[in-house]
């Protein structure tokens, strides 16, 4: 694959000049009252601009992350996207990182077609968002909920166990099973 930007370009013929959602499978976000994508769509419907889901990192999340540089707005939970940089480890503590959740407007396609591939030959969505933000409003939206990076083996296992425990039809039986195992 030639990067996330290339994957999004492959979907262009299906979009029909409408805003669309991008959900990356390695980020799972649990929020009991309002799913992450619903939070982003609500903000898109309110402001009518590209939305980038983000969350503040803590010390446990030490893998390389795309850290957002943004400017606060008068809108609660919404900031104006400026830039993104890759940060590793504790340098990322307390900073806002991109999640794998986006609501994009169709003008991203023209920008993606012009983005120069990086040193690995990948077309990066982050690069396209920087260009888009220089032309029009692009917002970051703080997503509420518990995030699991299921590309990380331990987070994958935690998500599996916690989701099973939350399910009404499995929770009690699964809890008993875990007690037997431990």
Predicted regions and their residues:
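Catalytic-core segments of class I nucleotidyltransferases/pyrophosphorylases
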Residues: 21, 34, 41-45, 74-148, ...
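Generic low-polarity alpha-helical segments
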Residues: 11, 68-70, 84-87
């Amino acid at each position: 694959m030639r990067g996330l930007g290339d994957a999004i370009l492959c979907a262009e013929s299906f979009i029909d000049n409408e805003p669309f959602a991008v959900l990356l499978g390695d980020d799972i976000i649990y929020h009991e009252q309002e799913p992450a994508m619903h939070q982003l769509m609500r903000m898109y419907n309110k402001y009518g601009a590209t939305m980038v889901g983000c969350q503040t990192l803590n010390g446990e999340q030490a893998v390389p992350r795309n850290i957002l540089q943004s400017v606060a707005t008068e809108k609660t939970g919404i900031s104006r996207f400026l830039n993104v940089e890759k940060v590793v480890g504790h340098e990322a503590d307390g900073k806002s990182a991109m999640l794998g959740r986006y609501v994009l407007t169709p003008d991203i396609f023209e920008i993606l077609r012009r983005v120069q591939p990086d040193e690995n030959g990948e077309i990066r969505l982050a690069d396209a968002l920087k260009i888009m933000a220089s032309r029009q409003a692009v917002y970051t939206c703080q997503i509420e909920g518990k995030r699991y990076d299921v590309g990380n083996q331990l987070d994958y296992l935690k998500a599996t166990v916690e989701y099973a425990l939350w399910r009404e039809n499995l929770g009690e039986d699964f809890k008993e099973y875990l007690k037997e195992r431990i």
